[in-house]
C-alpha cells in the first residue's frame, strides 16, 4: 500500500521507500523497501 500510495521521487529521494521502511519498523521488522510497487520488509 505505501509503495503505490505516495510513489514520487525528488532529487533521488523516493518517499515511498521511506514510508515502506517506517511501516516495516512499526510491525517489528528491520526496515524495508519497495520492489515493483510492493513493500518488502526485511526479516
Curated annotation (Swiss-Prot):
Pfam families, per the entry: Defensin_2
Keywords on this record? Antibiotic, Antimicrobial, Defensin, Disulfide bond, Immunity, Innate immunity, Secreted
| Primary location group | secreted
> Which example biological process does GO assign this protein?
defense response to bacterium
Q: Which Gene3D superfamilies match?
A: Knottin, scorpion toxin-like (3.30.30.10)
Induction comment: By bacterial infection.
The places in or outside the cell where this protein is found are:
Secreted
The intrachain disulfides are 3-34, 20-39, 24-41
Q: Which residue windows are transmembrane per the record?
A: none
Give the GO cellular component terms, alphabetically: extracellular space
PANTHER family assigned to the protein according to its UniProt record, in alphabetical order: DEFENSIN (PTHR13645:SF0)
Protein family (similarity comment): Belongs to the invertebrate defensin family. Type 1 subfamily.
Q: What does this protein do?
A: Antibacterial peptide. Affects Gram-negative bacteria including methicillin-resistant Staphylococcus aureus.
Name of the protein = Defensin
Q: Native species of this protein? A: Trypoxylus dichotomus
Amino acid at each position: 500500500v505505501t509503495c503505490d500510495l505516495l510513489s514520487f521521487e525528488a532529487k533521488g529521494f523516493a518517499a515511498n521507500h521511506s514510508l515502506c521502511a517506517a511501516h516495516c519498523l512499526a510491525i517489528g521488522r528491520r526496515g524495508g523497501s519497495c520492489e515493483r510497487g510492493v513493500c518488502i520488509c526485511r526479516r
